[in-house]
Amino acid sequence: MANHRNLAVLDAADSVADEINRLIDSRPRRVIHVYQLRKASQSIGANISEGFGRGPGPERDQKLRVSRGEAEETIRHLRANYASNRISRTDYWRLRNRLIAIVRMLSSLLREDYIIDPDLDDENTQSAAGD
């Protein structure tokens, strides 16, 4: 699996968090759920980094699941702001679609851990060859 410093999902998460910060800071009409929106968007990348810093295994998977939940929470806060006309349709859909892509990327990373285990495949191949 890739080093966390070279992960497209981490780059995407950082980019979304930066854009949300700019959006919040530039709105003439006050955005609602500011604290939660900032915190959730920043937590996506932070949890990805922490998970990959821990190495493969259940702790990494848990951090990736937390990141996925934070992305979903960010979408909910953006939706509330869009519904109350505090952010534009363009901003909402652009950020929402990018967050959906992040959720899918995280789900894919979680599936990789269970589908491909090179150590297990090597053991099974060697065992079958010896029979």
Question: What is each model feature region?
Answer:
Residues 1-131:
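Amphipathic alpha-helical assembly/interaction segments
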